[in-house]
């Protein structure tokens, strides 16, 4: 009888992957990022182990949206006080803080546990071309 062997946290080899978001569709990039952060692209994927890679996204402010989602989609937060439900449109987030927009969208595709929060810490988003991770990213 054969058994499937689960990988341990110590045995995971992590890479740094650079994604250029310029003129790419937002939802498709987020899906790709979430897959890489979870480690589902690796042959030894194990759901209860963080086996994903680091992701560096550049040109986050130059991403494209299909249809009119830029104006229609909203992100909500609540301050804790009565009647203080705050909403921000995607367009406003993209103009003011594209890093936050990418983190919020990716967080929605990751597990809502300690493991998901740990995975999200491996996402690095930058609005421009420059980033401080040139030493880690292969091919740069």
Curated annotation (Swiss-Prot):
The keyword Ribonucleoprotein applies. Keywords: Ribonucleoprotein, Ribosomal protein. InterPro entries: Ribosomal_uL13 (IPR005822), Ribosomal_uL13_bac-type (IPR005823), Ribosomal_uL13_sf (IPR036899). Gene3D superfamilies: Ribosomal protein L13. One of its GO terms (cellular component) is cytosolic large ribosomal subunit. Pfam families: Ribosomal_L13. One of its GO terms (molecular function) is structural constituent of ribosome. One of its GO terms (biological process) is translation. It comes from the Bacteria. The keyword Ribosomal protein applies. Belongs to the universal ribosomal protein uL13 family. HAMAP family: Ribosomal_uL13. This protein is one of the early assembly proteins of the 50S ribosomal subunit, although it is not seen to bind rRNA by itself. It is important during the early stages of 50S assembly. Part of the 50S ribosomal subunit. This is Large ribosomal subunit protein uL13.
């Amino acid at each position: 009888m054969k058994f499937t062997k689960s990988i341990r946290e110590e045995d995971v080899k992590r890479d740094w992957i650079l994604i250029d978001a310029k003129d790419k569709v937002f939802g498709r990039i987020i899906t790709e990022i979430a897959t890489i952060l979870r480690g589902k692209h690796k042959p030894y994927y194990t759901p209860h182990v963080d086996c994903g890679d680091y992701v560096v996204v550049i040109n986050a402010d130059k991403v494209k949206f299909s249809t009119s989602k830029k104006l229609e989609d909203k992100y909500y937060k609540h301050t804790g006080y009565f009647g203080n439900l705050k909403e921000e449109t995607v367009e406003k987030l993209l103009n003011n803080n594209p890093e936050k927009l990418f983190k919020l969208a990716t967080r929605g595709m990751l597990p809502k546990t300690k493991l998901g929060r740990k995975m999200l810490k491996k996402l690095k988003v930058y609005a421009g071309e420059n980033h401080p991770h040139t030493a880690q990213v292969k091919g740069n």
